[in-house]
């Protein structure tokens, strides 16, 4: 289905919906709890978030075609994927997150989004929203057109591996 949320929702309504979807989700706390148990030594797992307004502006600068595929590598609770879905017209929106608890939060948000969009009578489908629980280094992203990675805390080794992976992207 190619009826994009952007066609039905104003920017202010999209932001309002986004804020309500994330009102009870604390990605920082989820990440902190997970890192204490599993990843405490690796600083590459430090969680960070994006702002709706600024990320929307960044995406608009990319000028994606409607057949473009958007990836977020290290998608956390899925914020960039949800913002992209609400404000842009991509063919697919794919988030890849290694931390299970963050991934589960993203799935929960997608389910809440489905419920919120029911009032449009099935005209807006979240079928193109895909969340994968895995290391992005183990996923084939070569079909991606726009790749986002909030990599400010990625260590040198991870950045080198990511650079090699990005070289496989279509041009």
Predicted regions located by residue number:
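A short, conserved alpha-helix within the catalytic core of class I
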Residues: 154-166
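Conserved SAM-binding loop of SAM-dependent methyltransferases across substrates and taxa
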Residues: 79-90
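Conserved class I S-adenosyl-L-methionine
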Residues: 67-76
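S-adenosyl-L-methionine
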Residues: 1-66, 104-141
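A short SAM/SAH-binding and catalytic strip from SAM-dependent methyltransferases
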Residues: 145-157
